[in-house]
């Protein structure tokens, strides 16, 4: 008989069944084989004892973790014999690494896994998710039988502490939250242009100089002109002792920390400390205080490689990870093109160009890392010029790089921005806290499948996993870090763990509703738009009306709303699409059992005679971010901090022909034109309005040359309104002249500008 520690329950609760007792097991990520015994539960009392095998890897850590989780519900733990235990851990070495089995009956819970330990840890996570978050020493645990193992071996999340430093305690809490959802790789982006965050004893100036900057940019780098800064010095780094503590803490939760030391680009902070490792562009190197791609890169000379190898040696001594991430992305070649040493090296090595020089650089670093028994990961740019022989590719610019690498039989971690970049907005950017841009809501993360259909089953084996990336340009606090990460990391955890055919987004929403109670109990500052109303407006051709539909991700919830009124007491229950015939602002909120669960959301719809109308543009739009083909008549105005509702044109003269729903009389045309000088977007300098009865013969009814206040220092949506005498029209033509050349004293002065319009409104 195995010698074990024990766990028994000394008191039984007589409470009535909760939601999970009634046939529900709301576990995230969804186990790959789950059977629920409806109506049967294991009741927990105020004291529990567990039996854990003595030969189990990380036995002490697992015991301590389980005790901590149970204590959150005021449940004490105490050991006893295996025969008496009601939570029993049993070694079964026929199970693969990370696999586990969990059986819960009215008498006991049994977790089986092999002695490696990870499976037991994951079984504990599933068991604890069956314990209601609000149970207080009276928990009723749903009876289940689970046989489970992960879909992917690499289940990662990345945090960027270089742009904005996060404390050791913040990282430890992030590790705890990852562990709760069975993630096993934490990639920490430690160095970049804006900061160096790890102590290297041989090179103390890396932290003395490289971890500090005088200030930080306010807002997006392309929003204010000139850029604005907060004037507040920022600094911070992890000592080697901090790193050891984080690595050990993560290891106890079966998470491996992968460090990233950026090279050859994104190196401003390092070169500010040690400029001798640059190409010597004849300028002062500084730790950057705004976000961009900078020309400061490492110069591929012998002293640089000695420096990098010494740095990597200290890093590898601190991190037992099998991988070292070396970055390799967004490396400008300007410095190398004008550097005599680089050009001589290209010639000496018989390289084609600077791209092959970067490949040679990465090859050389890889040989050194391999000599230490480790492998490199690099962003997909390391494919350019030839891939290093043993490198693992992290594919972020879509899946193309990952597909190419897999076909070459290289390991791949899929992390395309469209599904995995959780620094993007997750709720309506018009009202959301500042993010880098784009839009990645919860369900888009959940929809991701990391195995491209273009790969054969054999090639798909090289896709070892996927990762969510949380870049830190705008993540200045621990609370905001959690807001950006959750609940999207929970969706990613299910992508990583659960077989694709077993995923169900509606069921995920149901389980997330349960697990949100645990997030709330832990004080996680998660995004609450799961509990908020979303607006979708569109023209209904069949009904010849503009309709707004409201929805929420939260199951079994009530949506209440009002028109042009933020007073919650006047909200009424939403039951059908809302027809609008004029400009209206909708306000709405989500309620569960009569209690409002999230914030009150609102959206303005600029419904007018052009809304929903078909139109053509000559030339065609260069880009559309929303509602392709009808973005100019979708009823939604743009706003200045994001280009989500804008349409861009790169020609100076634009003709837009609009077919109205019917012949009517009109007297006004309105549109918005965007000024973002950093993006070379300048507002329309002339708008001509023409009308027609047949779509062939047009007559001009008005022409306006707007005046703008270019003394403003921030991106601005300029409204343009053209008024004229009431005229009959079935078709309307707008001839819009762009902003011409970018003005003197501004970015790209003298170069052609771009025109961006949001909504054409006709009254």
Where are these regions (language model features)?
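Contiguous, structured surface segment used for ligand recognition
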Residues: 20-154, 480, 496-518, 522
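Feature activates predominantly on carbohydrate-active enzymes
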Residues: 95-323, 364, 368, 467-472
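Active-site neighborhood of glycoside hydrolase catalytic domains
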Residues: 288-289, 294-389, 396-404
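Aromatic, loop-rich ligand-recognition surfaces of beta-strand-rich domains
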Residues: 639-702, 716-763
